[in-house]
Design a protein with these regions (language model features):
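Glycine-rich hexapeptide-repeat left-handed beta-helix
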Residues: 2-14, 18-23, 80, 159, ...
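Terminal amphipathic alpha-helical/low-complexity segments used for targeting or macromolecular assembly
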Residues: 1-126, 220, 226-235
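Left-handed beta-helix
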Residues: 105-180, 190-196, 210-211, 215-216
């Protein structure tokens, strides 16, 4: 996972998306399917063949596609599981060997308490973990694409917290995005979140659900209650 080190969130999601585009082209040709990528969850997609980084025209179109980096992308056209030429979204995402390795790493980290070794393990997986961060036991950090998760310095992740960077939407369609948690945050036990940006000094109450209700939590906010709401800092 070294190629994701010292990269900004925007650089990482661009790298990840190019990797998936290349796999989509290969699998689409093999299974005779047209796969598209969209910058929105429901918008009209672009045929991945037009974004082939191995051709000159494709490189140009790819740079235009990334002229503005989005925080999430959607792939469609994989087909339903019952179709003979359908493509499993898990196979599109990662090769089998890496999927197996990441699942093993997640299983091991799942039972470890907040220790320096655990942080090193997460970094080895590709997760960006800041200095002084504490990740308690039974925290679920999505193994779909661990490198899309950024946890700031001196941030506490309470037990049973769930971070999910992807969503499978059925009918051969899935999306993924970035999760960014700032510095000095306290994420309460059992908090659940999808792609989101959380600024510094944010506190979530136990059991809070942050996505899809919010896409950005401002500095110093307190998030919780049912239904969820945000109490912003007066500073």
């Amino acid at each position: 996972m070294k190629k994701y080190l010292n990269k900004t969130p925007e650089e990482v999601i661009k790298l990840v998306t190019i990797e998936i585009i290349e796999r989509a082209i290969k699998l689409g040709r093999k299974n005779n399917r047209t796969i598209s990528i969209s910058k929105t969850s429901g918008g009209k997609g672009t045929n991945v063949e037009k974004l082939n980084p191995k051709t000159e025209i494709g490189k140009e179109q790819l740079e235009k596609f990334f002229s503005s980096i989005r925080r999430h992308y959607t792939f469609s056209g994989l087909g339903s599981p019952e179709e003979k030429n359908s493509i499993n979204w898990r196979i599109l995402n990662l090769p089998f060997t890496r999927r197996l390795l990441v699942v093993f790493q997640v299983a091991l980290s799942f039972v470890l308490k907040g220790t320096p070794f655990k942080n090193k393990l997460y970094r080895w997986m590709g997760i960006h973990v800041g200095r002084g961060a504490e990740i308690m036991q039974l925290v679920w950090l999505d193994h779909f694409r661990p490198e899309l998760i950024f946890i700031g310095e001196n941030t506490l992740m309470g037990a049973f917290t769930r971070l999910t960077v992807h969503a499978y939407e059925g009918s051969g369609k899935f999306r993924y995005g970035l999760i960014e948690i700032g510095n000095n945050c306290k994420i309460g036990a059992g908090t659940g979140m999808g792609p989101i940006r959380i600024e510094d000094n944010v506190r979530t109450l136990p059991g809070a659900t942050l996505s899809p209700y919010f896409s950005n939590i401002k500095n110093g906010s307190i998030v919780g209650w049912n239904p969820p709401n945000v109490k912003e800092s007066k500073e």
